[in-house]
Regions:
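Extended, basic/helix-rich recognition subdomains
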Residues: 166-169, 189
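Hydrophobic transmembrane helix bundles of membrane-integrated enzymes that assemble
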Residues: 1-167, 220-312
């Protein structure tokens, strides 16, 4: 948590757009290098042949990134970051090219989640670009906040055994909603209940703050937030994302909203953003960019404040 706070604080007062361009090009160069080394047989596996939980063996390409889902995930992150940086300058054919690249990569990775989220991100970027005035409408930001809260809410409910109603005899769920969603998530929810002795990740293993023993890895990202860091930091994380959506609205940052919403849906299924490698969560850069303008932290000629200085605001109000 301290690393994340320091990371956000380091972004304060910097040209985050310029920083994100550096992140974009260095990440893309690194991924292309890994793919080239893998294709040449020098480093990393080109493809994996296994049963990926679908009941049959298949060959899926990863090009040195370890797993097909990871390959499509990195493509998705680069597309979203590229759209955030250059969406306003893009022509219609650029979206067509991105759609085609996404489909071509899907033929190699067969990563359903990565393909669908990337598709939604490209489509959302196109809508923001061509629907003039949409990024200034309050309702789209309210809708984005609702989607984010639904993603968090479902993740919490899925981790609660009294809601999910796991059946430890047949390894299924008696709750029809959870059972139906799990049939499309390829074992993500099942892993919480049947993947470890203590049912790591379920609400029974959560604590108010982080515990040294809570270090188990699983895919569901929002569940990992509360399991790894604790309930209180998890709630702070939720509040910060809602605040970030509000800042998107105030700054008419439509592409920022698209990025946050599609990544929220992705984080229900995957934990790419909830990782010890905090630099790959591009939303943290945006939190840092907007942190200095937290309501009440600066006014007129007052010294600029940090987002974690909120308690000072309440002390000022009492005076």
């Amino acid at each position: 948590i301290l690393r994340i706070v320091a990371f956000i604080g380091a972004c304060k007062g910097t040209d985050v757009k310029k920083l994100l361009k550096y992140v974009f090009y260095t990440t893309m160069a690194g991924c292309l290098l890994l793919m080239a080394l893998s294709a040449a047989g020098i480093y990393g596996r080109l493809a994996l042949e296994a049963d990926f939980g679908r009941g049959y063996t298949q060959v899926r390409y990863c090009f040195g990134l370890g797993h097909p889902n990871a390959l499509h995930c990195m493509f998705m992150m680069l597309v979203l970051l590229g759209l955030y940086l250059y969406n306003e300058k893009m022509k219609w054919y650029a979206y067509v090219i991105l759609f085609a690249m996404n489909h071509a990569l899907y033929l190699l990775t067969d990563s359903n989640t990565g393909m669908l989220i990337t598709f939604c991100g490209i489509f959302g970027g196109g809508v923001i670009h061509y629907w003039k005035g949409l990024k200034g409408k309050k309702w789209i930001y309210l809708a984005g906040a609702v989607v984010f809260l639904l993603c968090v809410g479902f993740s919490v409910l899925a981790a609660e055994s009294r809601f999910a109603e796991p059946d430890y005899v047949i390894y299924q769920f008696r709750n029809p909603l959870v059972a139906e969603v799990e049939s499309h998530l390829n074992g993500r929810i099942r892993d919480l209940y049947y993947g470890s002795i203590r049912c790591e990740g379920t609400t029974a293993t959560w604590s108010l703050f982080s515990e040294p023993g809570n270090h188990y890895y699983f895919d569901m990202g929002f569940v990992r937030v509360f399991y790894w860091y604790g309930i209180v930091p998890g709630l702070v994380y939720v509040i910060l994302n809602i605040w970030l959506i509000w800042r998107f609205y105030k700054n008419k940052d439509g592409m920022g909203l698209v990025m946050l919403v599609v990544l929220s849906v992705y984080t229900v299924v995957e934990a790419h953003l909830i990782s010890v490698y905090i630099g790959r969560n591009y939303l943290l850069f945006l939190m840092g960019m907007y942190a200095a303008v937290m309501p009440g932290l600066c006014s007129g000629n007052e010294e600029e404040g940090y987002i974690w200085s909120v308690p000072i605001v309440f002390l000022k109000l009492k005076k």
